[in-house]
Amino acid sequence: MKCIILLAVLGTAFAQRNGFCRLPADEGICKALIPRFYFNTETGKCTMFSYGGCGGNENNFETIEECQKACGAPERVNDFESADFKTGCEPAADSGSCAGQLERWFYNVQSGECETFVYGGCGGNDNNYESEEECELVCKNM
């Protein structure tokens, strides 16, 4: 009986703690373009979006690490198991449609090297990596 009660309490606490992770990205009512992260239930990953600066909901984190801690970190190795050179390494760098200023890495097929570019925070293509190491792991090992 004590085990059942303990499991019920823990399950309720976990659901309450992470319930906001199921909320959609909400830019809020203001018009700033602040890069933030939300947990995307469709992909099971923390994804960047542009936050307006006020309003919104609790599925809104300043860093990807905060988002992953609250809602679950993806297995980075598994992210790249099905990587495709044509879509993940061949396209040119694409800044996307938002106005953020994030340093990212892309594979330049002309130079055969991973290089930096400025990512706006949303949109773009799959040739977009958080680190040089991540870019090289995917594109130089294919």
UniProtKB/Swiss-Prot annotation:
SUPFAM superfamilies per UniProt: BPTI-like
One MF annotation (Gene Ontology) recorded for this entry: serine-type endopeptidase inhibitor activity
Sorted UniProt keywords: Blood coagulation cascade inhibiting toxin, Disulfide bond, Hemostasis impairing toxin, Platelet aggregation inhibiting toxin, Protease inhibitor, Pyrrolidone carboxylic acid, Repeat, Secreted, Serine protease inhibitor, Signal, Toxin
Tissues expressing this chain: Expressed in the midgut.
Signal sequence residues: 1-15
One Gene Ontology cellular component annotation held by this UniProt entry: extracellular space
Keyword Ligase: no
Residues with the Pyrrolidone carboxylic acid modification: 16
Superkingdom per UniProt: Eukaryota
InterPro entries tied to this protein: Kunitz_BPTI, Kunitz_BPTI_sf, Prtase_inh_Kunz-CS, TFPI/VKTCI-like
Its job: Midgut thrombin inhibitor that plays a major role in keeping the midgut microenvironment at low hemostatic and inflammatory tonus. Also inhibits FXIa (F11), kallikrein (KLK1), neutrophil elastase (ELANE) and cathepsin G (CTSG), which play a role in the contact pathway of the coagulation cascade. Also abrogates platelet aggregation by cathepsin G and plasmin, and attenuates tissue factor (F3) pathway inhibitor cleavage by elastase. In vivo, inhibits thrombosis and promotes bleeding in mice.
PANTHER family: BPTI_KUNITZ INHIBITOR DOMAIN-CONTAINING PROTEIN, KUNITZ-TYPE PROTEASE INHIBITOR-RELATED
Name of the protein this chain belongs to: Boophilin-H2
Species of provenance: Rhipicephalus microplus (Cattle tick)
